Amino acid sequence: MAVAGLLLRPPPCVAMCTPSPSPFPSSQRRRRRRLTLAQPYCTLGLSFVSGRHHRFLLRRRRRTESKRTSRGTGVYASLFGVGAPEALVIGVVALLVFGPKGLAEVARNLGKTLRAFQPTIRELQDVSREFRSTLEREIGLDEVPPSMNYRPPTMNNSQQPAIDQSSDDKPEAAPYTSEELIKVTEEQLAASAAAAWNTQEPPPSQQKEAAATSESNDGAISRGSDGAGAAMSEPNRNISEKTETER
């Protein structure tokens, strides 16, 4: 029953469009009926127009903002606060007032006066520079704090602490390979053998002394043997002489 009631319920637009008994005449009722039927379409059109107008306003605002930024970032050339359009206006007014010949004469007079005042202008510039330099020096000397004037005592090279840079300067030792280990062991063995050989052999000075002592000992032994032989030969001679005399 509920489903049947929902299906049989008229739609809202039909309910809005159904004429109700009113005291108005038939022409006015028809007109109101047309307005009620065209109401959703009118609302759609108004929403479309409002959205389009909003987009147009956004575009216009963006254009104005871009123009403002471009104007703000532009470079304006000016001389003594006078821009190009202002200078053009001043020139046109001067031309109208003085005329071409009068303007030329005014320009010549201005040039002559500027040339005459050039040395004075230079002198004024030099004086201003000197005055500025003196002021800067005085202000700089006055502003220097007393802590800046203090100089720490100098230290001699002997008193300066030695800085151990061995740990910083030495590079990190790379790991040894098998070939390097073999070479190191061979070098150590050769060094130990050479040290043992040097300890066994006496130095050349000792060798010379030993040779000299051995030669002196040999000479003494040979001399002693010669003296003993001579001593033994003399009694033999005496004995032989005695035997001969007895005969």
Swiss-Prot record:
Residues 154-165 have a biased composition (Polar residues). It is found in: Plastid, Chloroplast thylakoid membrane. Pfam families: TatA_B_E. It is a single-pass membrane protein. InterPro entries: TatA/B/E, TatA/E. GO terms for biological process: protein transport by the Tat complex. The keyword Thylakoid applies. Its main location: plastid. Residues 1-76 form a transit peptide. Residues 77-78 are lumenal. Gene3D superfamilies: 1.20.5.3310. Keywords: Chloroplast, Membrane, Plastid, Protein transport, Thylakoid, Transit peptide, Translocation, Transmembrane, Transmembrane helix, Transport. Residues 100-247 are stromal. The chain crosses the membrane at residues 79-99. Residues 137-247 are annotated as: Disordered. GO terms for cellular component: chloroplast thylakoid membrane. Belongs to the TatB family. In thylakoid membranes, TATC and TATB form a large receptor complex, containing about eight TATC-TATB pairs, which binds the precursor protein. Twin arginine signal peptide promotes pH-triggered docking of TATA oligomers to TATC-TATB receptor complex, inducing a conformational switch of TATA that results in activation of the translocase. TATA dissociates from TATC-TATB upon completion of translocation. Part of the twin-arginine translocation (Tat) system that transports large folded proteins containing a characteristic twin-arginine motif in their signal peptide across the thylakoid membrane. Involved in delta pH-dependent protein transport required for chloroplast development, especially thylakoid membrane formation. TATC and TATB mediate precursor recognition, whereas TATA facilitates translocation. This is Sec-independent protein translocase protein TATB, chloroplastic. The lineage of its organism: Eukaryota, Viridiplantae, Streptophyta, Embryophyta, Tracheophyta. The gene is TATB.
